[in-house]
Amino acid sequence: MVSQDFSRDKRLLTPRHFKAVFDSPTGKVPGKNLLILARENGLDHPRLGLVIGKKSVKLAVQRNRLKRLMRDSFRLNQQMLAGLDIVIVARKGLGEVENPELHQHFGKLWKRLVRSRPSPAVADSAGVDSHNA
């Protein structure tokens, strides 16, 4: 079972990591007041980066609450997001959304991200089976 922690190796830490996701995202999921960008990372676990600027969410209390909620939602859903580098970009108005609504919204966004993700492993394994037959 995958651990549900949010340790250092599950975070995007350097500007280079963020730039890689911004420059060539393989998945893009727009949501209400936010945008999720994702890119394959070649690892067995996902990594998360958050971009919540003062322009989009004025109060530090709200920015911290949003970061806490985003990290928690990511932590609880990380087993279905394995192998992705994910950046969440907050937009204006996100700070006014209530916690239960945000949790529900993120649940839907993670599922949309997984559905939009290409699955080459399934196609490759099907090709291998057909050659052996």
Swiss-Prot record:
Record text on subunit structure and interactions: Consists of a catalytic RNA component (M1 or rnpB) and a protein subunit.
GO molecular function per UniProt: 3'-tRNA processing endoribonuclease activity; ribonuclease P activity; tRNA binding
UniProt EC number: 3.1.26.5
Natural source organism: Pseudomonas entomophila (strain L48)
Name of the protein: Ribonuclease P protein component
Pfam annotation, one family: Ribonuclease_P
GO biological process: tRNA 5'-leader removal
Reactions the enzyme catalyzes: Endonucleolytic cleavage of RNA, removing 5'-extranucleotides from tRNA precursor
UniProt key word Secreted: no
